[in-house]
Amino acid sequence: DALGRGNFYLCGHDRGGRVAHRLAVDHPGRVDRLCLIDIAPTLDMYNATDMRFATAYYHWFHLIQPNPLPETMIGGCAVAYLHAKLGGWGSRGLSYIEPEALIEYERCFCTPEAIHAACEDYRASAGIDLVHDRESRARGDKIACDTQVLWGERGVVQQLFQPLDLWQAQCAGIVSGQALPAGHFIPEELPLETAHALHTFFR
């Protein structure tokens, strides 16, 4: 409303995708089309936790530990931690990131405030967000609009989940999508391909 827009197309990657999912469920009349990048539904991911998932996404369980434990551990080696995350999850290192962009990532992430905010984000995901997701499912709430799902061929979503099936179960509209030849950071690894997929779906 503050932007003066009525209905809109919405796209989110990773945590942005989870926010987009919640927004589309809470305001079904406002989102005309939705694109979710490299996620399965949060509740399904937590419910399917096994050793493979916990190993690949250990940070989901590390970052939710009480403050200040994860903040202190990450803060002691913030650049190394950031590089490990950006270069992992099927991304095959940092070569896909321009040097100037990597410097900016480091500047933005490697502060106590940013690290704490990241941890709080994951704490919310394992806390109030799960409460809302469970309540929504109990009511039968679904995403009303057509939804596109994109995920990386080398990522955890591809390895451990069936994203189209999981999202179709949460959507009243049509779910389509595909795996792209990337790891987790699809927009950065494949910017042109991502833009093409979005343009095709949203036009």
Predicted regions and their residues:
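Flexible "cap/lid" subdomain of the alpha/beta-hydrolase fold that forms the substrate-access gate
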Residues: 1-11, 15-180, 187, 199
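Catalytic histidine-centered segment of alpha/beta-hydrolase-like enzymes
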Residues: 183-195
